[in-house]
């Protein structure tokens, strides 16, 4: 038995979707798993025959009895994911579907794809999902895979050093201001440091910082402040279902976080004292203004006691091994 994992390539260097799949694959390779590389492209440039041959090339190394961890979506359209699943099902193998995002739930305009999405999910032997709430939601739409694993949180494997963190009354937020409208509406006297490529007009107290390589970003953030995990109101329901990659990044940097009430990881954050759960931005601003040095240092201590499991990839190691056990064992 050999274990394989799909992995997308060819997207922008800034693509969080690609970064997440690449990170999981790096951990998987360290465990002895093998990569099935998938290039991101416009699939309709292929004829049916060409696409079938492309998929044959992806799965060419498989043997009967192997296990494949299928990271989904591939972002090559739902049609591509369906066809890849169908190709995998031709083999006498076990299939673990690792759901990063559910496209019909992310974007209301894509909800029409839900039935097709659930149909190919149901061909898996095991489903790994970001949260139990996501699993429950998918069951409401007809998912019937009995074996499931909860991811819980994104790791952020790194060896970047952490500087001593002092109380800085500032908030860090990597993200596109065009996607997160609250950035362009920031009217508070606490500065918001936005890490982005985009050149857009921003409020006076929003400080645009150009793209940073990962280790540089973590080291800069490690010097203090708070990491903000936030979405616009229209996306709050989805935030209660999925795992935010930003959360793992902030914690790996060694700084406390501020997150919206209802986030999928809320219990983990509360139980480990990793930051604050707030109802709105105004409450977040009030807390940043009122926190004292001792309280901040205690939060940092909690985060840095917790973050070795993220920096060494243990959430990912756990789901990769647990899902294989579930696939093989009844």
Curated annotation (Swiss-Prot):
Region feature (Substrate protein-binding loop): 106-111
Observed phenotype of the null mutant: The Fap1 protein no longer reacts with a glycan-specific antibody, and migrates as a much larger than wild-type protein. Fap1 is not able to undergo the second glycosylation step. Has defects in biofilm mass accumulation, the biofilm that forms is not as thick as wild-type. Deletion of this gene can be complemented by the ortholog from S.agalactiae strain COH1, but not from S.pneumoniae strain TIGR4 or from S.sanguinis strain SK36.
Pathway as given in its UniProt record: Protein modification; protein glycosylation
Residues binding UDP: 16, 179, 211-214, 244-249
InterPro entries found in the cross-reference section: Gtf3 (IPR043676)
GO molecular function ontology, one term from the record: UDP-glucosyltransferase activity
UniProt-listed Enzyme Commission number(s): 2.4.1.-
Effect of substituting residue 246 to A: Complete loss of glycosyltransferase activity, the protein forms tetramers, does not restore Fap1 glycosylation in vivo
Stored Gene3D superfamilies: Glycogen Phosphorylase B (3.40.50.2000)
GO BP annotations listed: protein glycosylation
Impact when changing residue 214 to A: Wild-type glycosyltransferase activity, fully restores Fap1 glycosylation in vivo
Presence of the UniProt keyword Transferase in the record: yes
Cofactor note: In vitro glycosyltransferase activity is metal-independent.
Keywords, in A-Z order: Glycosyltransferase, Nucleotide-binding, Transferase
Domain remarks: Dimerizes via the C-terminus; dimerization is required for tetramer formation. Binds protein substrate via an exposed loop in the N-terminus.
Biological role: Required for polymorphic O-glycosylation of the serine-rich repeat protein Fap1. Catalyzes the second step in glycosylation of the serine-rich repeat protein in this bacteria. Transfers glucose from UDP-glucose to the terminal GlcNAc moiety of 3-O-(N-acetyl-alpha-D-glucosaminyl)-L-seryl-[protein] which results from the first glycosylation step of Fap1; does not use other sugar nucleotides as substrates.
Subunit structure of this chain's protein: Homotetramer; a dimer of dimers.
Family of this protein: Belongs to the Gtf3 glucosyltransferase family.
Name used for this protein in its record: Glucosyltransferase 3
Gene that this polypeptide is encoded by: gtf3
């Amino acid at each position: 038995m050999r274990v394989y994992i799909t992995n997308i390539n060819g997207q922008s260097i800034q693509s969080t979707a690609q970064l997440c799949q690449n990170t999981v694959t790096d951990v998987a390779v360290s465990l002895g798993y093998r990569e099935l590389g998938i290039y991101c492209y416009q699939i309709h440039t292929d004829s049916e025959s060409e696409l079938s041959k492309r998929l044959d090339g992806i799965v060419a190394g498989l043997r009967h009895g192997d296990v494949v961890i299928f990271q989904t979506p591939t972002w090559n359209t739902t049609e591509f994911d369906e066809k890849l699943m169908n190709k995998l099902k031709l083999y006498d193998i076990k299939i673990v579907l690792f759901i990063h995002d559910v496209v019909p739930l992310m974007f209301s305009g894509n909800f029409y794809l839900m039935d097709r999405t659930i149909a190919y999910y149901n061909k898996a032997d095991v489903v790994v999902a970001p949260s139990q709430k996501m699993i429950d939601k998918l069951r409401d739409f007809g998912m019937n895979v009995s074996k499931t694993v909860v991811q819980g949180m994104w790791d952020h494997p790194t060896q970047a050093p952490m500087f001593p963190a002092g109380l800085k009354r500032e908030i860090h937020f990597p993200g596109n201001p065009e996607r997160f409208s609250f950035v362009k509406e920031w009217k508070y006297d606490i500065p918001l440091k936005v890490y982005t490529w985009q050149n857009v007009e921003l409020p006076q107290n929003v400080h645009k910082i150009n793209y940073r390589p990962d280790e540089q970003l973590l080291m800069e953030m490690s010097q203090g402040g708070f990491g903000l995990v936030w979405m616009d109101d229209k996306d709050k329901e989805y935030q209660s279902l999925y795992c935010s990659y930003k959360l793992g990044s902030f914690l790996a940097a060694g700084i406390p976080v501020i997150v919206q009430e209802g986030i999928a990881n809320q219990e983990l954050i509360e139980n480990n004292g990793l930051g604050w759960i707030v109802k709105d931005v105004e409450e977040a601003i009030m807390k940043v203004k009122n926190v004292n040095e001792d309280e901040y240092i205690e939060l940092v201590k909690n985060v840095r006691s917790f973050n070795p499991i993220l920096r060494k990839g243990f959430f990912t190691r756990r789901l990769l091994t647990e899902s294989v056990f579930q696939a093989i064992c009844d």
